[in-house]
Regions:
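A polyanion-binding, active-site-adjacent surface
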Residues: 1-172
Length: 172
């Protein structure tokens, strides 16, 4: 893909990984250095933290689908710019259409604002369900935020527990 300037600095396109029939999909912001190097989302420090949370909740990484808003690493881990997001949004829409998740967990502000709308803020929205077009969305902290502020880990786990409770209600 060469739809935006991120193609000039990336090593790999980091498309997405996981169960293509997953009931739960996680959407983050964009790849970091480790993800860019390995070509897979959430394999760096934030990914390890996410895997730990999965373990606590009894989720297997292979059971969910994990993607990002942008598929190439923004330089210096900056937030993706609007033109970069717009270049990738159709890829993300197609991923959602193919996977058909019942629940989408939005990891952080970039995912939240670009999927549900600019009027949403992560601090006010996290932990609260939003329904849109038949899909339930759970906004929560991005795992990288937990690395900067340990106190957010409790909220993150609580939000994922809400996801698991809702998933259990849906499958019963």
């Amino acid at each position: 893909c060469q739809k935006c300037k991120l193609c000039r600095t990336r090593q790999n396109i980091v498309f997405g990984v996981g169960n293509k029939n997953a009931s739960i999909m996680f959407i983050g912001e964009g790849p970091g250095a480790d993800e860019d190097r390995l070509g897979e989302p959430f394999v760096g420090r934030a990914g390890k933290l996410m895997n730990m949370a999965f373990g606590i909740l009894g989720i297997k990484r292979e059971e969910v689908y994990i993607a990002n808003v942008v598929k190439c690493r923004p330089p210096a881990n900056r937030n993706p710019e609007d033109d970069e997001v717009n270049a990738c949004l159709n890829y993300l829409r197609n991923q959602v259409m193919l996977v058909k998740p019942k629940i989408i967990v939005l990891l952080g502000s970039v995912a939240l604002k670009n999927i549900l709308g600019k009027e949403y803020g992560i601090t006010a929205s996290r932990g609260k369900w939003v329904e849109k077009k038949g899909i339930m969305y759970m906004p929560t902290w991005h795992p990288a935020a937990l690395l900067r502020d340990e106190t957010k880990k409790v909220d993150f786990i609580k939000d994922l527990q809400l996801v698991m409770e809702r998933m259990n209600d849906i499958t019963e």
